[in-house]
Amino acid sequence: MASSSCFLRSILFSSPTNLRSNHHLPTFFPKNYLICSHSTSSRFESLSVSSIGTGSTKKSSDTRRKVKSMATTNIGKEEKKRVEIYDLEENLVIDLAKFTADLSDKFCKERGAFTVVVSGGSLIKSLRKLVESPYVDSIDWARWHFFWVDERVVPKNHDDSNYKLAYDSFLSKVPIPPGNVYAINEALSAEAAADDYETCLKHLVNTNILRVSESTGFPKFDLMLLGMGPDGHVASLFPGHGLCNESKKWVVSISDSPKPPSERITFTFPVINSSAHVALVVCGSGKAEAVEAALKKTGNVPPAGSVSAEDELVWFLDKPASSKL
């Protein structure tokens, strides 16, 4: 079966013994936003929304790290959207780890599995607290199913590989079963690899590992963890590229990426936006303009501005990334 390629390769290439020997292992949100009130000390008191649809609020019990907490809701949708701004990147990753671990606990208890999608780039570094105590010992890693929102069509031991990045910094440090790590078949062409990955996802839907969104018919991942480029791209969906408008396919190939390597595969926006929870993690002043454009939705809105979620979208920003808001 076509789907077996994805599963077999996820097993073969998730184990370090099967990697090649040369792979080295060891004024925005008008009218309906909420913003924190600054305390007189060096700490900040943030507000969060407990039920955005009703407008009710509560004080957050954690006033240690957040500089601001903003919230809004999409008109006509139940989706919740939060923007969390942190004084230091280190504090951001602490809260991101708790956010991820809490969702893992929720879905493992509710459905016996936790489907997680990651991007490449700086996002993987932001997951570093998950491989430390207490999470490395408390998370039910055996129930995780691990995917990539996009991948470069290169060997898995190549420096451009999102698989290698995730393996070196994350997968090699946690006991996710190798068969639950879904890597692409990089021996195929970009187009064939995209088709193979989509077939793999459909098989997981048929076996009830992946849910399907009742509203869109696309796969519904439990958590999508995304980074954003300085140009506002997410996954391998770049500003002005036609793939941003793809509305039918789950996974597509790209052969003309403006960033090398040129050949990649990527989830489409309907798949990304059908996720239950999405975290968009952005750090650094070099991305501040794209953050501003994505959240204010003015001018040429970058792809990141098109990201949504069925249950909750959370932007995790450090102060430099939020400096133009």
Swiss-Prot record:
GO MF annotations, alphabetized: 6-phosphogluconolactonase activity
Chief localisation class: plastid
Example of a GO cellular component annotation carried by this entry: chloroplast
Entry-linked CDD domains: 6PGL
UniProt keyword Plastid, yes or no: yes
Pathway annotation from the record: Carbohydrate degradation; pentose phosphate pathway; D-ribulose 5-phosphate from D-glucose 6-phosphate (oxidative stage): step 2/3
One GO BP: nitrate assimilation
Renumbered residue ranges of the record's region Disordered: 51-73
Keywords associated with the record: Chloroplast, Hydrolase, Peroxisome, Plastid, Transit peptide
Highest taxon listed in the record's lineage: Eukaryota
Note: Plants silencing PGL3 exhibit reduced rosette size, constitutive expression of the pathogenesis-related genes PR1, PR2 and PR5, and enhanced resistance to Pseudomonas syringae pv. maculicola ES4326 and Hyaloperonospora arabidopsidis Noco2.
Subunit organization: Interacts with TRXM2.
Protein's job: Catalyzes the hydrolysis of 6-phosphogluconolactone to 6-phosphogluconate. Involved in the regulation of cellular redox state; enzymatic activity is required for this function. Required for sugar-dependent expression of nitrate assimilation genes in the nucleus of root cells.
Protein name per UniProt: 6-phosphogluconolactonase 3, chloroplastic
Species whose genome carries this gene: Arabidopsis thaliana (Mouse-ear cress)
GN (gene name): PGL3
